[in-house]
Amino acid sequence: MVFAQESLKRMFEDHGEKTLAEGAEKKGTIIFTGTLGSLRCNSEFASYGASRASVRQLAQALAREMSAKGVHVAHTIANGRIADADNEDTQSGKHIAAEAVGKTYLWLHEQHPTLWTHELDLRPAQEKF
């Protein structure tokens, strides 16, 4: 939450208070990385599920508040192991490649303010869901 507050403060200092309707450009992007626990959790994981759901709710509230002001806020659900190694597990889609996550986050950031993705589910290609 502190990261979001400080990021927003900096975005408004750098780009002003004008809204998109007033002709302002996009000010920036804040991406929250969550897990499947933000949507549902298993028994005996109530506290984990509550903490993940609260991050998702924060992202949704900020998206509603900041979208018109030119700040793109997104919540991603990274449902799988993210590996920074280029190996058989990442090449085959057993694990999520960190580079693929980075490219996806860049794609989110580069979206035009007329259409923004606010939630995105990231899963390894081999995962059964």
Per-segment meaning from a language model:
Residues 1-2, 48, 53, 77, ...:
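Broad hydrophobic/π-residue packing in well-ordered secondary structure
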Residues 3-7:
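Hydrophobic positions on the long internal alpha-helix
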Residues 9-54, 59-60, 64-67:
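Catalytic loop of short-chain dehydrogenase/reductase
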Residues 68-129:
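C-terminal helical subdomain
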